[in-house]
């Protein structure tokens, strides 16, 4: 099963977006977002909600809940 940060990377790359683009959307820096996407830091729930809306996917999908 994929980790949520792997799904976030796939969603971003599928849309040809850079980490800096998503960091701006979330109101954070590229460095902080990179740590989320690499699994080094836990992503806050409010960021996950924002990304669900942006990517038009469910939290279940991002979190790998089936």
Where do the PLM segments sit?
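Short alpha-helical DNA-recognition segment
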Residues: 16-35, 50
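Histidine kinase transmitter module recognition
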Residues: 14-15, 54
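DNA major-groove recognition helix of helix-turn-helix
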Residues: 37, 55, 66
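A short, Lys/Arg-rich alpha-helix, primarily the initiator
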Residues: 1-14
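Residues that mark the N-terminal boundary/hinge immediately upstream of a DNA-recognition element
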Residues: 7, 18, 44-47, 58
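DNA major-groove recognition helix of helix-turn-helix/homeodomain DNA-binding modules
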Residues: 27, 46-61
């Amino acid at each position: 099963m994929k980790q949520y940060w792997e799904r976030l990377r796939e969603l971003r790359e599928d849309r040809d977006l850079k980490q800096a683009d998503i960091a701006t959307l979330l109101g954070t820096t590229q460095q902080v977002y990179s740590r989320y996407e690499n699994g080094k830091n836990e992503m806050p729930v409010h960021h996950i909600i924002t990304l669900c809306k942006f990517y038009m996917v469910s939290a279940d999908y991002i979190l790998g809940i089936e």
